[in-house]
């Protein structure tokens, strides 16, 4: 999950250089402590505001909401994403065309997305237009005009999008991975919904979803950039009168449960095999979350377009980057609020079971190494790579705004980057070994494949290999 740091244009080159060089004179932690710090304000109604003024000429201001497909059921699956799409279609105050014209006039962009556990609506604009942006955000979130004709038009668009998504094999694969690993729980549901649920979502269901989920205690307004220092007072002006009264029951997440399982969708018209294997990971604020992130970095990723794998930083890439017919290889660590997925995704020719089994044997060998033999030198290298990716990705207003909002939604608190850096520094080889031993060794796997799956690795043998690590 991308984490990004917003710094002023004047500070950014110096910060990047100092972080990369990590000189003894100035520590990374000291550099980060000198960067702009985020401030958190909570309004009387529980609506939270986080601002980070970095003095830049632009700003990102958005509202992140604790909602998404994990709050849905099979009958209304896709309703959160459906509602998010309608936010762009006008309000009682601003028709769709007027909203678009108003944004264009100030050179602003309105964007939104829905994930399994959050919806975000945000605007990128000039620093001088921050109040206008907060006004627009409040209008689209509070006064969406859910007209029947607009809903029907968007329903058609969503069904087309759903059909087109079948061609995005990685997206299909990760939806299948959630469906297999979290079967019987709302985390198994796709954000997009299904061809059965979308046609039956009514205007009343959309209205009730907005009333139940767009409540102040479930929302965070996050602003990063220039001109955002007074956003907390603007939030009080435009969101301070929102109530926490629920006409129905308070939305809650049902308990999670991970199930070791296998699911294959064979389609020989797809030229390759797309595969993913994962154990249950940990929640965002779990004590082992950072250690698993660094372990994830240690294994790394590779693509066939890369010039070489023999000198790669990743041991796994060195072993199989040019063998076994691999086209793409990516280790992943997904964190939700209370659970996650830790595993490997790869694309391969899959002509031979020995090749595909060899891939998983190599992955299991790396997991074994991390659990029993990871060295301080290896972990230090992985931490440096993790830092580079982290701080590069934290350089835009938009991604830093998302990071700040997610911290509050998932943990109720906000870590400054200097605090996060201090936590990274504390992760040593022992912490990585213990985290992998606790969460990966002898754990059940969810295994899914799409495409040419005839040579899919044998599940029983792969699972048995998870408990043969210790000498």
From Swiss-Prot:
Source organism superkingdom: Eukaryota
Gene3D superfamilies: Metalloenzyme, LuxS/M16 peptidase-like
Regions annotated as coiled coil: none
Entry's localization field: Mitochondrion matrix
Pfam family for this entry, one: Peptidase_M16_C
GO (cellular component) term, any one: mitochondrial matrix
UniProt KW keywords: Electron transport, Mitochondrion, Respiratory chain, Transport
Main location: mitochondrion
Key word Transport present: yes
Listed InterPro entries: Metalloenz_LuxS/M16, MPP/UQCRC_Complex, Pept_M16_N, Pept_M16_Zn_BS, Peptidase_M16_C
GO biological process: proteolysis
GO molecular-function term, one example from the UniProt record: metal ion binding
Family label: Belongs to the peptidase M16 family.
Record-given protein name: Cytochrome b-c1 complex subunit 1, mitochondrial
Organism: Caenorhabditis elegans
Lineage summary: Eukaryota, Metazoa, Ecdysozoa, Nematoda, Chromadorea
Underlying gene: ucr-1
């Amino acid at each position: 999950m991308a984490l990004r740091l917003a710094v002023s244009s004047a500070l950014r080159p110096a910060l990047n250089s100092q972080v990369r060089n990590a000189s003894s004179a100035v520590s990374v932690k000291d550099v980060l402590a000198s960067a702009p710090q985020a401030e958190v304000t909570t309004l009387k109604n529980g609506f939270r505001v986080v601002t980070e003024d970095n003095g830049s000429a632009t700003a990102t201001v958005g509202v992140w909401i604790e909602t998404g497909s994990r709050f849905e059921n099979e009958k209304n699956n896709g309703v959160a994403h459906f509602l998010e799409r309608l936010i762009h279609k006008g309000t009682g105050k601003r028709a769709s065309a007027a909203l678009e014209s108003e944004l264009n006039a100030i050179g602003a962009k309105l964007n939104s997305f829905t994930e399994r556990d959050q919806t975000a609506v945000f605007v990128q604009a000039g620093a001088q237009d921050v109040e206008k942006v907060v006004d627009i955000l409040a209008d689209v979130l509070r006064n969406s005009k859910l007209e029947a004709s607009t809903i029907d038009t968007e329903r058609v668009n969503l069904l087309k999008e759903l059909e087109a998504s079948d061609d995005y094999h990685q997206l299909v694969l990760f939806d299948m991975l959630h469906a297999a690993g979290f079967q019987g729980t709302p985390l198994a549901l796709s954000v997009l919904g299904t061809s059965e649920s979308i046609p039956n979502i009514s205007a009343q269901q959309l209205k009730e979803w907005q009333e139940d989920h767009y409540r102040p205690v479930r929302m965070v307004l996050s602003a990063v950039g220039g001109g955002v220092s007074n956003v907390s007072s603007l939030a009080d002006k435009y969101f301070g009168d929102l109530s926490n009264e629920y006409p129905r029951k308070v939305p809650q997440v049902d308990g999670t449960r991970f199930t070791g399982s296998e699911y294959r969708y064979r389609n020989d018209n797809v030229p390759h095999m797309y595969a993913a294997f994962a154990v249950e990971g940990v929640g965002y604020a779990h004590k082992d979350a950072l250690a698993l992130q660094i372990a994830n970095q240690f294994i790394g990723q590779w693509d066939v377009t890369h010039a070489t794998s023999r000198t790669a930083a990743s041991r796994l890439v060195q072993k199989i980057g040019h063998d076994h017919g691999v086209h793409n290889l990516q280790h992943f660590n997904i964190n939700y609020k209370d659970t996650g997925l830790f595993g490997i995704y790869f694309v391969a020719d899959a002509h031979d079971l020995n090749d595909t089994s060899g891939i998983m044997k190599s992955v299991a060998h790396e997991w074994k190494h991390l659990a029993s033999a990871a060295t301080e030198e290896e972990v230090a290298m992985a931490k440096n790579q993790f830092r580079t990716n982290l701080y590069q990705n934290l350089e835009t207003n938009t991604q830093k705004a998302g990071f700040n909002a997610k911290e509050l939604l998932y943990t109720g608190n906000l870590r400054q980057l200097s605090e996060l850096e201090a936590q990274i520094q504390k992760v040593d080889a022992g912490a990585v070994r213990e985290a992998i031993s606790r969460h990966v060794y002898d754990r059940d796997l969810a295994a899914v494949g799409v495409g040419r799956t005839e040579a899919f690795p044998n599940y029983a043998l792969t699972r048995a290999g998870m408990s043969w690590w210790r000498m």
